[in-house]
UniProtKB/Swiss-Prot annotation:
This is Riboflavin biosynthesis protein RibBA. Keywords: GTP-binding, Hydrolase, Lyase, Magnesium, Manganese, Metal-binding, Multifunctional enzyme, Nucleotide-binding, Riboflavin biosynthesis, Zinc. Residues 1-199 are annotated as: DHBP synthase. Residues 200-398 are annotated as: GTP cyclohydrolase II. It holds the Pfam family DHBP_synthase. The lineage of its organism: Bacteria, Bacillati, Bacillota, Bacilli, Bacillales. Its cofactor is Mg(2+); Mn(2+); Zn(2+). It comes from Bacillus subtilis (strain 168). In the N-terminal section; belongs to the DHBP synthase family.
Amino acid sequence: MFHPIEEALDALKKGEVIIVVDDEDRENEGDFVALAEHATPEVINFMATHGRGLICTPLSEEIADRLDLHPMVEHNTDSHHTAFTVSIDHRETKTGISAQERSFTVQALLDSKSVPSDFQRPGHIFPLIAKKGGVLKRAGHTEAAVDLAEACGSPGAGVICEIMNEDGTMARVPELIEIAKKHQLKMITIKDLIQYRYNLTTLVEREVDITLPTDFGTFKVYGYTNEVDGKEHVAFVMGDVPFGEEPVLVRVHSECLTGDVFGSHRCDCGPQLHAALNQIAAEGRGVLLYLRQEGRGIGLINKLKAYKLQEQGYDTVEANEALGFLPDLRNYGIGAQILRDLGVRNMKLLTNNPRKIAGLEGYGLSISERVPLQMEAKEHNKKYLQTKMNKLGHLLHF
């Protein structure tokens, strides 16, 4: 159904248009995408004719700053925070709307000799400013277009157009597949592009390592920072780094302040953390990776808001969704990079969560065995554990 990212990059380098599909839990739409440097009148006309949506030009922050392209509005209330700037035309265009003139304006954006006064405001080209960090920071078509351009070795700019059906509705994956076949286009997902970037780009930096005696034994603790969002993560390690080919006992644990520190009975996080450290110490070799992904990625305050909803009868999944979040926002790409830095290639993973296994394997790590980590249910977390089993697929038994 979808093509490898490498095939899409080859097509873009040849001046072809591709289709990029975003997450079904986001807009669930497809955009035509081309490199800005290959945005010929023919490409613009193709997008206008067969895409029918708004043609925009995603740009890196550097290009936007150089040309003094400011946000369209001071307070962005768009649900996806799409970063439109004021629309533009090149001053030498007439109406600015024809395929030829839109192509001319796009090419002028890439010209290093262009200055802000070369462009009229408003116009018929709609620049979008991509966030630094690209799809790893924001999983949108804007960032995907700029990431793809840079991966092609081209200037950080693209041209995109939402794809609509003939009846004016948004084209979803089944229709997009037919459109791709009809026009012989490569089609990729932003999800695959995110994975491609995690596998290709090192985004964590080892900052420090210390020896730490604990109630569970003496560990070597490695501190890391994430270059994209500045978050800090730590790995508690027993054994010699780098590890060899022999499977290593690993626990990837997401931060839970209420459970890990204060002994909350609403979850099983604290007991899981302690059990994992005990098992690693008993084996004398292993890694506990502590990721700062509080509340399955929604943050501490939002987790407390979710708890408030649970007091009103919501379960843990329903509470997240009521707050506008997915049930689980965690991403394991950064964790995989830290494990690779520690020389972990093959592991025995302490987890009840099959999605965690898939998440880590998707970044090139091998999991030879799943080691269950089920804790005894308590009065206040039994519903929580049953929901994780029934709705999130956790491998638990009651």
